[in-house]
Structures are given as structure tokens and as C-alpha cells.
């Protein structure tokens, strides 16, 4: 027995390893793996089905076909194990060695490995510095290459055609050496001196200045250094020995009917062996050169096809015309080894079935069909039966279970008790897609699911299926119970709000229950408490909605957490009093004393969780559900056609609109409006009519008139079923009711343009044929969109997970003082997101001071929970600097303080939490709710876009920031700065509204002045951009020559004449170099200086500028000198929805990005070229000016002589994130991406915490480009991991050396995933071949830091519960311990096993 145990131990030995290295295999290494050479292309004997000797399935090389039995049958049984049969040469051992023993083929001529040849950039080409084309010509025997020039004038690596070679032979004889084929390339690679080459290249690099040459040299140096450091030899890229895959990994399976199913690899290997053997024979026979060459080329092609079929030339096809699957195809793509078998496996002990509702379940339960449970828990049942002595052997137990004896069911009940199972619904978009429940045995065949978890699973009961999995080991059960139980996942990880919220029927029931009604039965009663309320309701003495007075006892927590009771008489309704009975102690009565809609219920559960914690919340959620279902049933709310009340006014509204449309049509026919204007106006009219109809309809539905107790009429909220459903948030929306009872309105064509005749009918009246046909467009587009959206959203999630998968919380506090400044999100007059929502659950980076004092309100490193946020609001703080993952200083991973609160648990995040994956899921999961389309702006929208004034909504004081201004002659402020912001502050100094003020706006109120609500504070002309003078004096024209640089135009209506500056294209040759400008001089004719500088005030005028002043006129500061007409931007498409999110995360450059100033200084314009202007910025400190060419058609925001700061906008447009990072830094680009992504999600009403987007941004900023190397080993211009530069610089500074300087890079998520340090993770994501080729050449080590790599090598992941295991391993490693393997005797083992089973299965009564 002992031997057997030892033997079993030996069979399952595990290797402890810390990293995986990939490198080129040398021929000797391949031979050392091999168990013998495969010499023949035969596979198995078709009569005996035995493998042929020396063939591809040879038993002597690869091992026996049957366990412990040699091929000829001389040795059978375990006792002969390890014997090698002298007759057939097969070792007697397990057959599974056929999965691990490799063979090899000795190639008669070397062949190039296609990956290193054709995977761009070609490694062989880069190493030899030869073009790929030339190398291929040599390899495929079209030309010669010179290997050794000798004393001749031939250069090494020179390519010779057949003729040139023969000429050279005649001329030089055997002075030189030239060959063709892979031998030639092998000789070239072999004779390279890598270190020497490196030296020469580095010297060359220091001498050259041309950018392209430097790039090329750095590439070669990197490759050469990689070879030197990894110990790879260049000639190993040419194969002389080919490894053969173990036969069980490329099986040959006999089908019935004498046919065989085989892996494509066998075909590919057979071709290689056939050609190789033929080549050997030809060489032995000393065949003519041309025949041998042809055979060598064929061998090269066969090896290429085996390694990567189809990479070069046409793919080799099998008998059925489909390309054969080569070794490379085995590992790449969705069906490849990585994604199919290593990252996703099928698991045992699982089942799936349809789901139905389980409204009587508790939150932690699910209904499991008996049939399924019996099958899933079989091993446990067998064990239990044997333990009880009811079955003597496992076989007997099996029989009992198959007969389904009565005792089996009792045992099943025992086994299932307290044994959680996991339920999963595909697609699993976030971690709440798999949760644990305690099974309850039920009859029937469908799984019952608790209704409240449907939101998390996104499940409904229209035929959805779910899978059940059984956690087998004790640890797995523990994790399922502690971490995955549905009761532990009440809050959504995406936004920290409850995800266990009632919906649909439950909401309707609670809403119906808490509504009040005028003059209902029993109004005015005074009741002793909720119990009496329920009694009189059940007795039929009072209606649920009756307004009554009830004595209510509320409990409140004091400082010590004790409950203090207060009792009072409350005005409420019978229904609310009944509902109060299930509300847990500690919540105020006001929480139910209102008509409860979906939002209110969600808020109620949230409050409960924050005040009372997990357990009461779970019980409360369950109770609300039961109550909701019960009262929804009692309400009898139903929908009939009469509930859809059509407003009387509808008819007249539509006829008015029709009249207006007819009028517009007349104007169009008489030529007063253009076709475009007519179309836009018609659409506006119908849109307005539709709104009026729907408003009339909603007003009609919303209220009803009833007689109250005093006999008077009174308005009350309607009890119309449809309205109640929409109002409570149970189902439907105002827009849907509008289609039922209002009018359907305008429809779009398939291309997105709006059809100008609306559908005036609604669904109650019914549509006619034309209307129905028009409707079909939209309906079909909706379906097509949904299908596309799902795929796109899934792909976005996959890329996000891949880029963030290795980000884990690794330490408690990194100690940084960096952070990002959080302010409320304000757009125009609305606060889109208040400050408390943005800072809740974050850690302060600096002390927060009480506004206007030096008192510390919140100390540094405080986790801001709800109470702190209340304090901030009470003290009207409107900006808080909080820690952020983007600025976290941890080298690998992030620290808990920079992340803040774990949103799903409500406390600070634990170490080992996989925040990267959580972030990716939180952003990706709502992806399917985003729209797919780009929005076209036309009609009403585009006209409203040209604003010309700012009107504030609230009263308060004005605060201007980034402002330069002058006072004009009438005493008003005129803005002369570009990016001025106007904020409206309330009396506490909180920002209520925020607006952008353009250049040239005239302010009605100045900085710090008080305004009333509704007041207009700024005006400007939206169609022209003014040129405003900052000084007073007299105008002097310079270079303004009529006919050359300017032309006079007279307005026909007013008779005023104005000067228009000609565009440089329209000028005569004499006027090309003139620079028209307006100079301001004083009465003596001297230049006036711009205040604060020593520059004369002169304003250069761009083309098309209009001047309405004459030479020599007196002007005062703040006056408009000239106007530049702005072309109104045509209808620009706004990319919205999913494509916009993808663009942001992929960091794509917009089509026409904004042009930003690269340095601070004074703007001037240099010499123009065709179609472009030269913009020159000269720094004030006199360093080198910066030049940029800008296309003429771009509208510029700056004038000559203006001062700009680095990062200022020179020409408007969407900003490119790379520019923001380069010019304004990491925080600015974070703020930009976070805000832009949030805008898209906010439009759809999806809440995601900023943290998640910041996590992804941190991963996008993973790389840095070295600017100067200092004393480090980096090359300049090299892109390296930011953490590596940080660590290297820290070490260098500690030794007093100079560190490297670098700039951060922003990579898109796909690029960032492929650029990770881990080649395993990158290879399993995309472009497998390229990643593996690169890694092999560089001899990369994968440190297995991320989650993906560890899943692939089959270990616990270094996150969650696996985090401790990895920490422990590292500690043991550091201490140099060996993991102890205890010496166990068989008796001990079996005893402890029995003990464990008893303890684990609750049967320790020793029967």
C-alpha cells in the first residue's frame, strides 16, 4: 500500500516556478527533447491498426499504445514496468507518455523558420540588414549571396543572379564564397559577431542626425542586444532539426467503415518527411544541382506550411479544398489553444435548465430540480451511503442511486444542506453574472430564481437558461458562501448603489399601496398603530388609500449604536402604515410616508444599508418583495383600451400645424425660403406639435377630478393603470404612452434623415398602410442595431479586461501627495453631478480647509464616507483634492488609499482585490445600453447652437476665471482672453452654473458682482469674431493698399462703405508679401504700447476681415477695430454612444483635431506656402521659436502679436488626447477622458464611478518614451514600461548617478494590451504570432504578475483569495525554503482522510 501511495505521489509531481522564459530552441536542445528520429512517413498499419516502426506514431519512439503492455505483447502487467522489450523495442509504461514524448526529424538541408522570416518586421532581415525580398530570393533558390568576398571586389551579403555568379566564377575562381538557400543565410548568421556589430552601431548612432536613420539603428541595436543578452544564437532561426509533436496531440482515429479521421498536422509532417527522404536520396545519388535545388525549395515550403500554413504563398489544402491547420493555427484565434482551452474550460459537475420565478424564495435561495441535484451531488451521495453502511461499495451505492431508492432522497437532503451552488447566466458581463445560492429541492425541471437578483443577471423569464455549478472542495464552498452569496452582493461594483432593487410588479404593488386618494372609504380615522390599520383594511372598513392618522413608533440610533424610540401621531394612509410594519428599526417613517416609485424604493434600500448594514437590508428587501407581490395582486391593475385616453385638443393641434406647413410651402414656392430652410422649419413645426399633443395627453392622464368629503370638486393624481405603471417606474415611459395615446410623430429613413410627414395617428387609433410602412424602417433598424451593438460591446469589454487584468491592489498606502482636483460637473446652468457624488468613497490627498479660513475641516488621508460628505456640503466646499489611481506611486499594482472605497462592500478596498477587471466589467457591462449611431444635428438643434448671450438661472455672484479684459467707452467690460470661464456662485461660495465666454463678449456685470436669476450677463455676435483694441489712440493703416491688399465694398441697403482685406490668394503679386495691419498711435504719431509689455499696439488683419473705420479716426480701448466673419460650421456629426467610448479608450486622433500651442510665447506668422500658413511662436525668454504649418481653411483663434500659454487652443476642434497629455500633463488628460466617457454614459442614464475610468487611463499611461538615457541602460527614443523607468531611476539616484528623463505615452487599449510586459497575456489577446516571435527572439521572461498569465499556466490567480498564496510563496522563496513534502504513511493518510470526510459531511457521530 505504501509503495502504491508513493507511486501515486510520484505520478502527480508539481513544479514550483516563478517565471516562464521563451527562447529559440537550438538543434541540440531539440535532439535532447526527442526520444528518437522519425524516419518514415507511415502512420499506422491499416490492417492491424498498429503503429508502423520509425513512423509518425512509432511506439518505440513515443511509447506504448496500451497501458503497461509492449507492442508485440511479450510483456504485460505492472510488474514489468520500465522494461524495454528486446523484440519490439517498446518501453513498458503508461500510455499517457504518448502525450509528452517528442520525436525529431533530421533535415537533409537547413530551412528557415518562417516566423522569423515573414513575421514583420523580419527578424532575419533586420539582423543581417538585408531587404526581405533579397533574403527570400536566396532562400527559395533564385539568387546567390556572397558569404566571403576574399580578395575580390565582391561585398559580403551581396546578391548575385545566376549569370553574375557564373561571371564571377570565371573571373575569380574560388577566391570567393557564394551560396544559395538556407545554408547561405545560416552561414551569414553564424559568422556574425554580435557584440562587435553592436559597438559599431552605437558609434554610428552617436554620429547621425537624420531621424529615420536613427530609428533604424535603434531598432537594430535593440534586436542585437536582445540576442546577446538572451543567449540566443542567430543561426538558430534556421532549423536543421525539426521537432515532432507527441502523437496523442495529433491523433489518428479510426472511424467505422475503415476510414480514418486525422489531425491536419499528420499530413503536414508526412509531406516534410517525404520530401526530406527524397532529398537525402538525391544527395546520396549526387543528382544534378537543379534537381537538388528544386527538392530543397520544396522541403523549405513543406516546413513553412507545417509551422504556419498560408503565411507565404498559397496555403496548402487538404482533400476537401480547405487549408490545413498548421501549428501556428493551433494556438491563435478564438478556437486556438489559448482562448479555447487555457482561458476557458468546460467544467464537470454542472448542469443547465430554463429558469422560472421563485417569488416565495428567500434572497439566498434558489430552487433546484430534484433530478438535477441528484446528478450533481452524486459523489457526495455515494460517500454518504457508504459511510452510513447502507452500501458496501461505491458500485452498490451507484446502483441504489440509479434505482432512486427512498433513502437516497433523504441523503440528498442532508448533502445539500448548507452546500451552496453557483448559478450563472450567459453572457456573464460582470461579476454579478455568477452568484452563489443555497439550493432548495423542488419538483419539476426548471430552476427557480429569486426575482430580486434578476437585475444583476439581466435575466427575465421568457425562456432564459441558466447553468448550475457545484463548488466541490471545502475552500470553494467557503468562498462561495463568504464572497459570492447573493446576500453579500447587494451593491453594484460599478456605482456603489443597490442592485437588489425591486422592479415591475413589486414596484407597482408598493406604489399602489402607498398612494393616497381623496375621500376614500375610512378617511379621517385615527388608529392606534400599523396592526390596527391592517385589521380594518382586512375587515373591509377602510380602503388602502384612505388618509388617516396613525400612532407610529420610530427608532433612531444614538452615538453608542443603541436604538431610541419616539412615538407620535402621523398623517398618513392605511397602506403606508401597513408597509411600516416591515421596515426595520432605525429608519425614519418619512421614508415610507410618500408614494413610493422605483427611485424612492432604491433610495430606501440604500439608506437602510448605510445605516443598519447588510443583514437587516437583506431581510427588508425580501419583505418588500413579498409585500409588493401581494398588493400588486390585490390592486388588480390591468390595461384596457379605454385607459389610453386621447386628448380632445389633438385634432386642433394637428390642423394648426398643417396650416403652418402649408404657409411655409407657399413661401418656398414664391422663393422666400430655400429648400433646406423649408425642410428644417417643417420638421420644427411637427416636432413642436408632437410635444404639444403629448403634453396635453399627459396632463389629461395625470390628474382626475373627484368629489371630496365636503362635496367639492378636487384634482388628484390619477389612478389610470397605464399612468400608474409609468409614474411608479414599473414599466413604460411617457414616450411610450405618447405613441399609444398621443401621436407617433416624426420617423427617420434608413439613412437617418427625418421624413417630413409625421405619423399623426397613434396605436389606439391604428395606423394606415403608409404610416405602417414608414414605421417599419425604424423597427428594423432597431433590431439590426441591437445585434451589432452586442458584438461591439462584447469586444470593447474584452479589450478593457485585457488591458486592465493585471492591476491588483498590492499595498496599503504608497504615501503620495499627488491627486486630482474634484469639482462638481456643471454644464451651463445645470449641476450634472454634485461634488458629493464624485468624492464619496475617495481618500483626500491634502487637508481640506474650511472655506475662507485656515482651519482643517478634513485631514489628509481620510476616506470620505457619507457623514464626511455631509460635512463638506454643510461648509460649502466646492473643490477637493482626492487620491487617484492615475497618480498612485506603487510600482506594480496600486495602493488601497489611492483607490478608496470598495464600491460593492462600502469599506476601504482590501489588498488583492482585482480592481482592473472590476473596472473593465463596470465600463463594459452597460455597453449594450449605449446607442450605436452618430447623431446628425439639423433643424432646430443647429440653429439653437449659435448662442449669442449668457443668461443665468439662479441668483448669486459672478466669478470670472482665466480672464483678460478692457473697459470700453461706455464703461462695460470687454473680454480679450480666449478661454474665459464664468461661474455663478451662491451665497456659500458654491458653484451653481458655469459658462464659457468667448473673445469679444461684452459683459453686463463684472467680476464679483451680484446678479438676479434670469439676468443676461454677457452678449456677443455669434457670426463674426471681433478684433478689439486694448489701448486708446488714433488708427493708422499700414500696408492697406486699395486693390492690392484691400477692397472697398458698399452695402446696398445702408450705403455704408467698408474695407475688406483680401485673402492672399486673391492678391496681386505686389500685395503678396504685404501684411495689412491697424496700428494705434497717439496724437503725436508715436506708437502706443500694449499695457504691461514693450510691444507696440498693432493688429494684423487676416483675410476676409472687414474694417468699418477710416484711417486716422480716434478710438478708445475696448472698441471693435475689425470683424472677421465666422463660417457657421456645417452640420457636424457628433459621434455618440459606443463608438465614442471606443474612440476614447483607443486614444484615436480626431479627424480635424484642435491645434494647441506647443510652447508659451508671442504669436506671429511667417512665410506662407501653398495652402498652409506658417505659425511661429517666439518665447519671451528668447529661446528657440517654434514653427508649425497650419492649413489655410482652419479658423484661427489668435492674432499676430498675441501672447499664448502652452496648451492654449490656437484653432478650435475636438482635442486629441495625446496633445493634452503632452502639453497639459497627466491630470488634464485623465480629466478629459473621464469627463468625455461619463458624458456618453450619462446621456443613457447609466451611472459609473469615475474610479473605474481612471483605472483604465492608468493602464493606458503604462509606457514612457526615454528622452535622454543618463546613466541608465535605456536607449533614447525607446518605449519602456513606466514602472521600469521609475525603479531604474530610483536605483541610479540612490547611487548618486544621473537618471533617465522621459515623457509619458498614451496608448490605446489594444496597443497597451499588446505592449504589456507579459508575453503570455499579449499572445492570448491578439496577433499571437507576432507577439511570440518577438518574445522568443528577445528571450523574454514572463514574471506571471497578471491574472491571465496565471490562469493560463493553471495556478491560483494573484488576486482575491489567491493573493495570500502568492505572497506566501514569495516569502518562502525569499527565505530560501523548500516547500516541505511531509512523509505520510498510508495508515495516517487514510485515517486523516476519513476524519476530514466525516467533518466535512457533517456525519461525525461515528455510526
UniProtKB/Swiss-Prot annotation:
Binds 1 Mg(2+) ion per subunit. GO terms for biological process: DNA-templated transcription. Zn(2+) 2 binds at residues 814, 888, 895, 898. It catalyses: RNA(n) + a ribonucleoside 5'-triphosphate = RNA(n+1) + diphosphate. Zn(2+) 1 binds at residues 70, 72, 85, 88. Mg(2+) binds at residues 460, 462, 464. Keywords: DNA-directed RNA polymerase, Magnesium, Metal-binding, Nucleotidyltransferase, Transcription, Transferase, Zinc. GO terms for cellular component: DNA-directed RNA polymerase complex. Its EC number is 2.7.7.6. Pfam families: RNA_pol_Rpb1_1, RNA_pol_Rpb1_2, RNA_pol_Rpb1_3, RNA_pol_Rpb1_4, RNA_pol_Rpb1_5. SUPFAM superfamilies: beta and beta-prime subunits of DNA dependent RNA-polymerase. Its cofactor is Mg(2+); Zn(2+). Belongs to the RNA polymerase beta' chain family. The RNAP catalytic core consists of 2 alpha, 1 beta, 1 beta' and 1 omega subunit. When a sigma factor is associated with the core the holoenzyme is formed, which can initiate transcription. PANTHER family: DNA-DIRECTED RNA POLYMERASE, DNA-DIRECTED RNA POLYMERASE SUBUNIT BETA. This is DNA-directed RNA polymerase subunit beta'. It comes from Salmonella arizonae (strain ATCC BAA-731 / CDC346-86 / RSK2980).
